[in-house]
């Protein structure tokens, strides 16, 4: 999944693309892992973990997903890598009692898995937080793109 790390004053930014929204979210998460550790060990001696988040919009969902991964790192003492993501969009309309369609405020849902690499086995720098600064999620002619800034 393609992503590039971008220099950002006192922070690090990830610019990612994906042919689908799920691919995009996984690519940004892989970029977060790359921002944390230059050499991620190959598959071996790891544990798989599940993650799930809900949010009202795509940027909020991406923020909450990345924030959850940082939390998982801190609580489980692992670096989340090799992300697999599934997204479910909110229902767009419901029938009301007057038989007219009305927009709903239901949330997007993300469920996924990642491989947890023990932090004790790698030389990782701490990514403190995801930010909304300059964050964007956009549909493009070839799929989706995102830009996310992390506080380091």
Which ranges hold each PLM region?
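Intrinsically disordered, low-complexity regions
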Residues: 2-152
């Amino acid at each position: 999944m393609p992503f590039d790390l971008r220099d950002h004053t006192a922070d690090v930014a990830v610019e990612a693309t994906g042919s689908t929204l799920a691919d995009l979210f996984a690519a940004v998460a892989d970029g977060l892992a790359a921002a944390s550790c230059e050499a991620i060990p190959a598959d071996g001696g790891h544990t798989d973990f599940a993650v799930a988040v809900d949010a009202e919009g795509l940027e909020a969902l991406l923020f909450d997903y990345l924030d959850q991964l940082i939390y998982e790192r801190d609580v489980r003492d692992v670096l989340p890598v090799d992300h697999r993501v599934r997204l479910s969009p909110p229902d767009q309309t419901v029938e009301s009692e007057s038989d007219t369609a009305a927009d709903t405020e239901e949330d997007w849902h993300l469920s996924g898995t990642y491989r947890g690499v023990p932090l004790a086995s790698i030389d990782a720098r701490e990514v403190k937080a995801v930010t909304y600064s300059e964050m964007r999620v956009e549909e493009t002619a070839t799929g989706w793109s995102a830009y996310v800034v992390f506080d380091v």
